Amino acid sequence: MQALQSSSLRASPPNPLRLPSNRQSHQLITNARPLRRQQRSFISASASTVSAPKRETDPKKRVVITGMGLVSVFGNDVDAYYEKLLSGESGISLIDRFDASKFPTRFGGQIRGFSSEGYIDGKNERRLDDCLKYCIVAGKKALESANLGGDKLNTIDKRKAGVLVGTGMGGLTVFSEGVQNLIEKGHRRISPFFIPYAITNMGSALLAIDLGLMGPNYSISTACATSNYCFYAAANHIRRGEADMMIAGGTEAAIIPIGLGGFVACRALSQRNDDPQTASRPWDKARDGFVMGEGAGVLVMESLEHAMKRGAPIVAEYLGGAVNCDAHHMTDPRADGLGVSSCIERCLEDAGVSPEEVNYINAHATSTLAGDLAEINAIKKVFKSTSGIKINATKSMIGHCLGAAGGLEAIATVKAINTGWLHPSINQFNPEQAVDFDTVPNEKKQHEVDVAISNSFGFGGHNSVVAFSAFKP
């Protein structure tokens, strides 16, 4: 979420978690192409093994993905979500949740028909902010996908199972309503749930309370880089032996008047009200800002040892990640891409992956004037040859889901690995000349993914990159 023209205030760099560098050698093996439409995948990198960096081999430190859950503008089912993406369908429409007629931007990736039935009881359904509802539903669906739904969760050591689901904005509806009650009716009319349901850590807390998970539990809030920060931190808890399993990702529900108005005030949003479905057009010369989205994307991450011991359905492997800061500007990215390129390089180092092994990038690609090209410049610094790499933009269809963006995009990345199909970047009408990658324009493409990276960047100059591949024993 970068690329505004604002004041020259400088952001301070974050203090990211650092992973211990206890690495062992790993011999890469090339396998056949995966079966299409299956959750399990056994692709591996096809690059030469002679000079490849060292990958983790210790099953206690290898981190695998065993479950995925989401709430999205395309519904709450992972397979249905990816089918919509593959078909190139736009989830963007005019906002009808409130009267947006006086806003210069009147559209977004608004979720409709959401139901938490079977996941949240009626009393909490009425009280909870949508941000919290999305977190709980996506988290429980991820556990079901990991074969840990219901009583099956009692088969693991809950003292070593944690939750790390972040959010950029927190319970914005609850916060907005609390302020309105204070102004209009006085402090006595503020709900006792105002503070608990507005703070950013409550999604992780409520999910853990509901499920009895006593492992590491907190949230990270780094704007639109939030989900990837959570994946990175969760994996490090596993690698350090502090957890066997982590539920990690992001959640967001900011399509309300104060959320829309705030981003309008930042001059961040597209104003293509006459044609909302073509408004999110990353890398297109006519792009005019990002489109707000909402939802949640959550992964179940486990040590390989723990997953194998319980016979878990392994859908991919988390190879590594990195986080850093541009230390440049509150909202604008560095034009030279140095922060992002450094983050990508550190991610590959952490993953034990050479640049030549990466052949798919799920880009941050928000459809902003400065941000899209800054990311491309950064990618070119790391990957000297662009011919073998395909890049796509999930946000072209679902909008920018802020703190949940990386979670929903990680799921799209894993599905690309599993299926051998990349979803298109839609609304590619007149691409920037500098974008000489294959952006999978307007139509899906079949592509065997060796190693994928997923980029997420946020206000404050927060950069995050995570790497995935098919799991291979």
Curated annotation (Swiss-Prot):
A single GO cellular-component term from the record reads: chloroplast stroma
Please list the GO terms describing molecular function. 3-oxoacyl-[acyl-carrier-protein] synthase activity
**Active site residues per record:** 224, 364, 400
Instruction: Kindly state which keywords UniProt assigns to this record, in alphabetical order.
Output: Acyltransferase, Chloroplast, Fatty acid biosynthesis, Fatty acid metabolism, Lipid biosynthesis, Lipid metabolism, Plastid, Transferase, Transit peptide
Which EC class does it fall in? transferase
Where in the cell?
Plastid, Chloroplast stroma
Compositional bias (Polar residues) at which positions? 1-10
| InterPro entries assigned to the protein according to its UniProt record, in alphabetical order | 3-oxoacyl-ACP_synth-2 (IPR017568), Beta-ketoacyl_synthase (IPR000794), Ketoacyl_synth_AS (IPR018201), Ketoacyl_synth_C (IPR014031), Ketoacyl_synth_N (IPR014030), PKS_Beta-ketoAc_synthase_dom (IPR020841), Thiolase-like (IPR016039)
What's this protein's family per the entry? Belongs to the thiolase-like superfamily. Beta-ketoacyl-ACP synthases family.
Q: What is this protein called?
A: 3-oxoacyl-[acyl-carrier-protein] synthase I, chloroplastic
